[in-house]
Design a protein with these regions (language model features):
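N-terminal "arm"/small-domain region of PLP-dependent enzymes with the aminotransferase-like
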Residues: 2-66
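Conserved N-terminal alpha-helix of the aminotransferase class I/II PLP-enzyme fold
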Residues: 59-104
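General beta-strand structural signal in soluble alpha/beta enzymes
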Residues: 95-99, 122-123, 176-177, 202-206
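Conserved PLP-anchoring active-site segment centered on the Schiff-base-forming lysine
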Residues: 114-129
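PLP-dependent aminotransferase-class I/II
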Residues: 132-177
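Active-site core of PLP-dependent enzymes with the aminotransferase class I/II
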Residues: 176-199
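Conserved small/polar residues in nucleotide/adenosyl-binding loops
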Residues: 210-213
């Protein structure tokens, strides 16, 4: 296979030098900067190669074996391969890799598990939580009764006593843990225990920070 990406960049230099300049400057900025934003991990060149490949041209609406258009045989194989790998990494029975981004995936989880107005608990935004975990201005905070736990100011870790107290008081249908700017290890076992105690779904949003499987 030809070095398609390099050829494309060369063409961009010729046909759209303004955009090419921005691309080169952004690449330089990224490789000269230490970024601490969890959602901005440097993507593997293997991933960017596939994202910019001919698979981008293919309409794959639907699921493997149940597409709405023809010619998806190889795309089906690629999706099934990715699904099996995800399930193996996380020891999961099921997986879905079709979401365009994490926030859309989060909305799908909430819509699938909750009814409008149901109560759920999440980490407050100003303590490192994510806006899709019930921020008032977000869909998740408008459609559902989102309540928030926080961080213990002395330990700077999620206040598990507060989580349990709120769970016992409000009996949420779901408790989510995960964050956009909380760099500590999360006590998943502690959350699991609290969810079991109150009969809540336990949702781990690990798209931004998660220990290597």
């Amino acid at each position: 296979m030809k070095p398609v990406k390099q050829d494309a960049v060369k063409l961009l230099d010729i046909f759209d030098p303004e955009m090419a300049s921005l691309l080169h400057r952004e690449e330089k900025r990224q490789f000269e900067t230490i970024g601490l934003i969890a959602s901005e991990n440097v993507a593997s060149p293997l991933s960017t190669c596939l994202e910019g490949s001919v698979f981008t041209n293919k309409n794959t609406e639907g699921y493997p074996g149940k597409r709405f258009v023809g010619g998806c045989e190889l795309a089906d194989q690629a999706e099934l391969l990715a699904l099996e790998r995800v399930k193996k990494v996380f020891g999961a029975e099921h997986a879905n890799i079709q979401s365009g981004n994490a926030t859309i995936a989060n909305c799908a989880v909430l819509t699938g598990l909750l009814e409008r107005g149901d109560t759920f608990l999440g980490l407050t935004l100003d303590n490192g939580g994510h806006l899709s975990h019930g921020a008032k201005f977000h869909y998740s905070g408008r459609e559902f009764n989102a309540l928030h736990y926080g961080v213990n100011r002395e330990t700077e870790r999620i206040d598990m006593d507060q989580v349990r107290q709120m769970a016992l008081e409000h009996h949420p249908k779901l408790i989510v843990t995960g964050a956009s700017s909380y760099p500590r290890m999360i006590d998943y076992a502690g959350f699991r225990s609290i969810c079991d105690e109150v009969g809540a779904y336990f949702w781990v949003d690990c798209c931004l920070l998660y220990t290597s499987p």
